[in-house]
Design a protein with these regions (language model features):
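Glycine-rich phosphate/diphosphate-binding loop of Rossmann-like nucleotide-binding domains
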Residues: 8-25, 30-31, 150-222
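Buried hydrophobic positions in well-ordered alpha/beta secondary-structure cores of metabolic enzymes
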Residues: 13-16, 69, 131, 173, ...
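Buried hydrophobic packing segments
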Residues: 23, 27, 204, 298-306, ...
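N-terminal beta-loop-helix "entrance" segment that forms/cooperates
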Residues: 35-59, 228
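N-terminal glycine-rich phosphate/adenylate-binding segment common to multiple enzyme folds
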Residues: 51-156, 243-245
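Short acidic loop-to-helix transition motifs that present clustered carboxylates
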Residues: 113, 219-226
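Glycine-rich phosphate/pyrophosphate-binding loop and the adjoining helix
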Residues: 135, 141-185, 190-194, 312, ...
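Glycine-rich phosphate/nucleotide-binding loop
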Residues: 228-330
């Protein structure tokens, strides 16, 4: 008898409400073809919930979803009614911190039918992963303001790095590199950030000693961004601190054509808590309700979830179906087509079912 996987479904705001159903449609097709059983538990925590309750989620949110294997997440944010920092820190960042989702994983891959803004790049030439530390570093939320509103105003925000935090993300990245092309690149800025980044470099070098078969190098973040644009074929696995990983994980998908179809995973590799899978794109209030949002980022995030749950063949089937639709259509308007959100979801689900 197949194991039933309990998944918390949070569409969130804006186009999250439109693309999540398409992701579920494809995952249901996967379930039929591969004999996987899902239990979808739906939660309406969003900026709409905030408008009614004054907070993004109920006080017992952790009890409600803490026993699920994964969270299938749409998008969060409705700036017209809720400031972005309140929406993010009241939901998504809580999941990352309190569920110890210390790995943010983003594939960077040039797909068929998606033109890269980089001249003459073809599918197969851009194919790597960005591994971002997701719970500490530059995004510590530690600091404050003094003498607000005066000419003496001082603002301090501190970075917080821990040995356990750095070592576990580096271990994950080196092990991923071992499974792929045995090449790891570390992002740094130790020529300008004189305490935390030299320490980060030391941790990378120390961890590399455990993986003698993995070739590794490091670049300062400024030149690394340039290399992403000029030489994206150099990379296989790129590991970075929270801030630098945040920058790179938007730049990478942009180099491969569009961040509009990019997926991401926020992982607790030990599976002590649920991991979260979401598209990179935001809630896009400007197109919400028009039925034109591209669902591929959400569907591809579902493929990452399948891989994490132990179904690599099912994950590969979804990615193959995505590639076919990107190459042959139907496409949404952002991809120079005229298909609706649902039509793209239908096409990918049909390809998955057909095998």
């Amino acid at each position: 008898m197949a194991k039933k996987h309990k998944i918390a479904v949070l569409p969130g705001d804006g186009i999250g409400k439109e693309v999540v159903p398409e992701g579920l449609k494809v995952l249901d097709a996967v379930a039929t073809r591969f004999g996987i059983e899902f239990q979808w538990d739906h939660f309406d925590w969003s900026c709409d919930y905030y408008a009614e309750h004054g907070k993004m989620m109920p006080d017992d949110w952790k009890d409600q979803i803490g026993q699920h294997e994964a969270i299938f997440f749409g998008s969060i944010g409705w700036p017209a009614t809720v400031p972005d920092h309140e929406a993010l820190w009241g939901s998504l960042f809580k999941f990352r911190r309190e569920f110890d989702q210390y790995i943010n994983l983003r594939p960077v891959r040039l797909m068929p039918g998606v033109p890269s803004p980089l001249a003459d790049r073809k599918p197969g030439e851009i194919d790597f992963f960005i591994v971002r530390e997701n719970t500490e570093g530059e995004y510590s939320n530690s600091g404050g303001r003094l003498f607000e509103g005066t000419d003496r105003e001082v603002v301090i925000q501190e970075s917080v790095f821990t040995r356990i935090g750095a070592e576990r993300v580096l271990k994950f990245a080196f092990e991923l590199a071992q499974k792929r092309g045995k090449h790891l690149t570390a992002a740094t800025k130790s020529n300008g950030i004189s305490i935390s980044m030299p320490w980060w470099d030391e941790r990378v070098a120390e961890m590399a000693g455990n993986y003698p078969d993995v070739r590794w190098d490091k670049y300062h973040i400024d030149i690394l961004c340039a290399h992403f644009v000029q030489h994206p074929d150099w990379f296989d696995v790129v590991v970075a601190s929270n801030l630098f990983g945040d920058i790179l994980s938007d730049l990478g998908p942009a180099c491969s054509g569009t961040i509009g179809i990019a997926p991401s995973a926020n992982l607790n590799p030990e599976r002590n808590f649920p991991s979260l899978f979401e598209p990179v794109h935001g809630s896009a209030p400007d197109i919400y309700g028009k039925g034109i949002a591209n669902p591929i980022g959400q569907i591809w995030s579902g493929a990452l979830m399948l891989d994490f749950l132990g179904y690599p063949d099912a994950s590969a089937a979804v990615v193959k179906a995505i590639e076919t639709v990107l190459a042959e259509g139907p496409r949404t308007r952002d991809m120079k087509g005229n298909a609706s959100t649902a039509e793209v979801g239908d096409a990918i689900a049909a390809l998955v079912r057909a095998g």
